[in-house]
Amino acid sequence: MRHKLGYRKLSRTSEHRKALFKNMLNSLIKYEQITTTLPKAKELKPKIDKVISLGKKNNLSSKKNLFTQLQSKTSVDKLIKVLSQRYEKRNGGYSRVIRAGYRYGDDAPLAVIELVDRDIQAKKVDVKKKIETPAKTTPETKTKKEKTPIKKQSK
């Protein structure tokens, strides 16, 4: 019987599960949209809603509680400064889970969990790192070199 089962164990120990959700919460706050398996997304949804509700209180004790849960100063700052302002008139339902097909390797059901009214530019936070790497072709090789006629010398 499945009476009184409060949460999904996800085949992990309690410490592993706690670290997994801490990292997923930080990623969701940073990028505002992540792709994961459906059970993880369903388990993450109430956690992110509680974290955002705690961030909306914006007092010292809520900041300390957020930092103990997330352990990331940048995530706590974004929660309090950006997300709490965005959702100040919303009374819950800050995230949504959208089914996204099945994974190729193991046929696991995938889902996209995203924040409602998310900032689309938030996914492009780390794009600078990819752009700064030198390209394989240089601009000199792309341009055609002008051919100059070669004069043969007579003997």
Indicate residue ranges for each PLM-predicted region:
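Structured, basic alpha/beta domains of bacterial-type, RNA-associated proteins
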Residues: 1-150, 154
